A protein has these predicted regions:
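Gram-negative bacterial Sec-dependent N-terminal signal peptides
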Residues: 1-21
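A periodicity- and composition-biased signal for non-globular, repetitive helical segments
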Residues: 8-9, 145, 184
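N-terminal small/polar-rich segments of proteins
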Residues: 22-142, 154-157, 161-208
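C-terminal charged interaction modules
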Residues: 143-151
Length: 208
């Protein structure tokens, strides 16, 4: 019985020494503890808007930090292009028939990390339209950084579905210049409104 107890005690001493072998040692001048590092990595996406730099004048993109995320104010506008607005204007080629287009450049910066592919697109859609029937959101038809030369360079931005305005294959972290505007039609009668109006455009970055 005594022999069994002695063997057990020695065994426990050996286990204790092994437990601390990495952090302390005797009869040596080096010790090598180990540290296991753990982290849960997630993929991430970001799409930011900012004031443009390409056109002659720019309507400021204001970061609200909430809902809506950004705002842009075109100022006072009219269908004949009498008011200058806050940025750029293409007056109607045929007043009383064609719309006046007030427009501005803006920048989009997509950033994505940890994705299994770099294929991506950016879309835009009017998700809340103007109440006024004589006002609509327009975008540059070319989807490029080239400054539009006339009203003909603009087309109505989609309301029922989103329009692709960049991609596929946009580079992460690179700002893109695009153009957006408000078209004021020379209409009269029911549904034609004046005064302050607003619409909401939703931009979507998809990496797939």
């Amino acid at each position: 019985m005594k022999k069994y107890l002695m063997t057990f005690a020695l065994g426990m001493m050996a286990l204790s020494t092994a437990a601390f072998a990495g952090t302390q040692a005797t009869n040596t001048n080096t010790v090598s503890p180990t540290l296991q590092i753990s982290a849960t990595i997630q993929k991430a996406v970001r799409l930011t808007l900012s004031t443009g730099t390409a056109a002659v004048t720019h309507c400021a993109v204001v970061n609200n930090g909430g809902n809506p995320d950004y705002t842009m104010n075109f100022g006072t506008v009219d269908a004949l292009g009498i008011n200058a607005g806050n940025c750029n204007l293409f007056g109607p080629a045929n007043p009383g028939v064609d719309s006046a287009i007030y427009w501005s450049d803006y920048n989009l910066t997509p950033i994505f990390t940890g994705q299994s592919t770099s294929n991506n697109t950016i879309t835009a859609q009017v998700t809340t339209n103007f109440t006024a029937a004589n006002a609509s959101i327009v975008r540059d038809s070319a989807n490029s950084s080239t400054v539009p030369a006339s009203a003909a360079a603009f087309t109505a931005l989609g309301t029922a579905s989103a329009d692709t305005i960049a991609g596929p294959g946009v580079t992460s972290g690179t700002a893109l210049t695009r153009f957006i505007g408000v078209a004021i039609a020379p209409t009269n009668g029911a549904g034609t409104l004046t005064g302050a109006q607003s619409a909401t455009v939703t931009f979507t970055l998809t990496v797939n």
